A protein has these predicted regions:
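N-terminal glycine-rich phosphate-binding loop and ensuing alpha1 helix
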Residues: 1-73, 81-83
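Left-handed beta-helix
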Residues: 1, 189-354
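Conserved beta-loop-beta/alpha segment of the NTase-like Rossmann-fold superfamily
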Residues: 68-153
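Structural motif
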Residues: 9-13, 62-65, 114-116, 141-143, ...
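Catalytic-core segments of class I nucleotidyltransferases/pyrophosphorylases
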Residues: 111, 118, 124-131, 144-146, ...
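Short coil/turn segments at beta-strand junctions that form active-site/ligand-binding loops
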Residues: 2-4, 56, 107-109, 135, ...
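Short internal beta-strands
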Residues: 57-63, 139-141, 306, 324
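Conserved beta-strand termini and adjacent loop/short-helix elements that scaffold enzyme active sites
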Residues: 63, 86-88, 140-142, 162, ...
Length: 354
């Protein structure tokens, strides 16, 4: 095993500098670790991946105001590792907070995970027993064809970037002993921790190497990125709907429905996941759709979409596709409109469609 310990850096909200881009989710769910993909927060996906990789101790480090949400959001699973929840001190930067984990890390290499990515590759298969030396880091990187702005920004600040053209950090790194102390002053914007960490290490004479990964997804700034992550997560599910209440309903493919979910007079074509307390009636739910807790879908068609908790979708005249419907949102039909329909609705929004 390459590392027996891991630190999950559960950062807060991200802000994109790209013109015209804005958060598609408000409230605590806007923090990347809490965004649900296949009805499970990214933080829970990260913990599951570390557990499967054989990590024995995990510390989740979250800023003040977010730490309470992170511990409540994760299901009480029978992890094989010891899990510690830590709150970042007010005013403390990322680097200083990591340096403050000296007792937990005990001068051992560790996995740093930003809880904003998904992987189908097991951790222990990625590095084949390699581990970084003192003051060194191994960063996982992924192809960024057409999405290389972050790479350009990194290379502009550094004469010898560890990132190849069209590659950017994948959100996970293995850090050697001494790295956290060297990076004590690092305090980047959420989502750019690994870029700044690599910059600081190289400027100080440290070695930063990279390993390309495949079958990997990392969170972007828009709804399309979230939908792609949801598709990625749903591709691996196995059918499990035996406990749900089903009436005059056709189930096709991999469908997961919580035992408290109710589905009546509908067609559900997987991969689809239906959360606790959700109710689907006289509707079609197509592939790559996640339906959150207490959602109501009535007399509508939807596919390749994410419906956040407590939203209601009722009597639409056109199929809802490639859409993100925020928590508590209302989408309903009042008047006839052309068939094409694509929406991203924020938390608490109410939209009536003619």
């Amino acid at each position: 095993m390459i590392a027996s310990k891991a630190v999950i850096l559960a950062q807060g909200h991200r802000h994109s500098s790209a013109p015209g881009r804005h958060s598609f989710v408000r409230g605590e769910l806007a923090a990347p670790p809490l965004l649900p993909l296949a009805n499970r927060p990214l933080l829970e996906h990260a913990l599951e991946w570390l557990d499967a990789g054989g990590v024995r101790e995990v510390a989740v480090l979250a800023p003040e105001g977010l730490s309470a949400y992170t511990s409540r959001a994760v299901a009480k699973a029978a992890w094989r590792f010891d899990l510690t929840w830590l709150e970042r001190s007010p005013g403390a930067g990322v680097g200083a907070s990591l340096a403050g984990l000296a007792d937990f890390l005990a001068d051992e290499p560790f996995v740093l995970h930003l809880a904003d990515s998904l992987s189908r590759q097991p951790l222990d298969s990625l590095l084949r027993q390699e581990q970084p030396g003192d003051g060194e880091a191994i960063l996982f990187v992924q192809e960024t064809a057409g999405r290389g702005a972050a790479v350009v920004d990194i290379r502009a600040r550094r004469t010898a970037s560890p990132f190849a053209d069209h590659c950017a950090p994948a959100g996970v790194a293995i850090l050697g002993t001494g790295v956290t102390e060297a990076a004590r002053e690092v305090d980047p914007a959420p989502g750019h921790e690994l870029e700044q960490l690599a910059d600081v290490l190289q400027r100080g004479g440290g070695q930063v190497s990279t390993r390309r990964v495949a079958d990997w997804w990392r969170l972007g700034h828009d709804a399309d990125a979230l939908l792609e992550g949801n598709r990625f997560a749903l591709e691996g599910i196995a059918a499990d709907y035996g406990g749900a209440t089903l009436s005059r309903t056709s189930i096709q493919g991999a469908v997961v429905a919580h035992p408290s979910a109710i589905v009546e007079s509908s067609v559900i074509r997987g991969p689809v996941i239906i959360g606790p307390g959700a109710r689907v009636t006289h509707s079609y739910v197509g592939p790559y759709t996640s339906i959150g807790r207490d959602v109501v879908i009535e007399g509508s068609e939807i596919e390749h979409s994410i419906v956040f908790p407590a939203a209601r979708i009722q009597h639409l005249s056109s199929r809802l596709e490639a859409s993100v419907v925020g928590a508590g949102a209302r989408v309903s039909r009042e008047f006839r409109l052309p068939r094409a329909l694509r929406v991203t609705v924020g938390d608490g929004a109410e939209v009536s469609l003619a």
